[in-house]
């Protein structure tokens, strides 16, 4: 009896684990499909051409199973079949006006669907996003620290080159030429006759070597 209860408890634990694994897989798949649908709806410009507002991937699988049971071949409802009409499709019941009216409600329903699934899957795995990851800006270089100290002195002017004074003589001012009267001619030489005559008149006659004759000595 104890072995039977033990085996039954082990089976119930296994069933619980399998159920929890299946729930996790379904929540991940639903969050993945909802995330892909949300990113596709943001990227699509014309919503009226490609929007399937109230249908998800799981609903389409259920509809396909209802239309085509496992015994029948789904290829029978192809374009070559004359009995097939577009009224049999899922999208034929919706007109363009219905799609336009359903777009805000569908977005609200998607947001309501996404929020609990994301809350469930937040503890397990993050939902994949198709948008590019934001690249972080490179860090700015640090600002240069202010230098505390005296201001640098202005550069000195170059020293004058010494010039030799011997090579260059300073320019002297030119003196003006003063032109006066012509110099006088010297007098002509006097004749010896006149000289002798003059001496004879001024000097007494010398007669012998007497003291009287040389009074000036």
Swiss-Prot record:
Entry's localization field: Virion tegument; Host nucleus; Host cytoplasm, Host perinuclear region
UniProt keyword Mitochondrion present: no
Compositionally biased spans, kind Low complexity: 106-132
Sequence segments annotated as region (Disordered): 1-217
GO cellular component: host cell nucleus; host cell perinuclear region of cytoplasm; viral tegument
Chief location of this protein within or outside the cell: virion
Residue ranges of the region described as Interaction with host histones H3/H4: 63-64
UniProt-annotated stretches for the region Interaction with host H2A/H2B: 81-84
Composition bias type Pro residues, residue spans: 136-145
Superkingdom, natural source: Viruses
Record key words, sorted: Chaperone, Host cytoplasm, Host nucleus, Virion, Virion tegument
Feature: compositional bias, Acidic residues: 43-79, 89-102
Listed Polar residues bias regions: 32-42, 208-217
Domain comment in the entry: Binds directly to histones through its N-terminal domain.
Protein role: Histone-binding protein that binds to histones H2A/H2B, H3/H4 and cellular chromatin to overcome the host DNA damage response triggered by the viral genome ends. Interferes with histone ubiquitination and recruitment of repair proteins.
Quaternary structure, from the entry: Forms a complex with the host H3/H4 dimer and histone chaperone ASF1. Also forms a complex with host H2A/H2B dimer. Interacts (via C-terminus) with BGLF2; this interaction is important for infectious virion production.
Sequence similarity: Belongs to the lymphocryptovirus BKRF4 family.
Protein name: Tegument protein BKRF4
Organism for this UniProt entry: Epstein-Barr virus (strain GD1) (HHV-4)
């Amino acid at each position: 009896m104890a072995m039977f209860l033990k085996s039954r408890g082990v089976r119930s634990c296994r069933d619980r684990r399998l159920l929890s694994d299946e729930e996790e897989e379904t929540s991940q798949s639903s969050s993945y499909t909802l995330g892909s649908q949300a990113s596709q709806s943001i990227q699509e410009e014309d919503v009226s051409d490609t929007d399937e507002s109230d249908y998800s991937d799981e609903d389409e699988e259920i509809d396909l199973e209802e239309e085509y049971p496992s015994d029948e071949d789904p290829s029978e409802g192809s374009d070559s079949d004359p009995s097939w009409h577009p009224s049999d499709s899922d999208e034929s019941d919706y007109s363009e006006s219905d799609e336009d009216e359903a777009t805000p409600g569908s977005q609200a329903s998607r947001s309501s669907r996404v929020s609990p699934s994301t809350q469930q899957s937040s503890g397990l795995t993050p939902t994949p996003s198709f948008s590019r990851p934001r690249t972080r800006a490179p860090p700015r270089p640090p600002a240069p620290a202010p230098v505390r100290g005296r201001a640098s002195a202005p550069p000195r002017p170059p020293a004058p080159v010494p010039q030799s004074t011997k090579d260059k003589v300073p320019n002297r001012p030119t003196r003006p030429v003063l032109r006066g009267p012509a110099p006088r001619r010297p007098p002509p030489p006097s004749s010896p006759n006149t000289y002798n005559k003059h001496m004879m008149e001024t000097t007494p006659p010398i007669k012998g070597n007497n003291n009287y004759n040389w009074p000036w000595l």
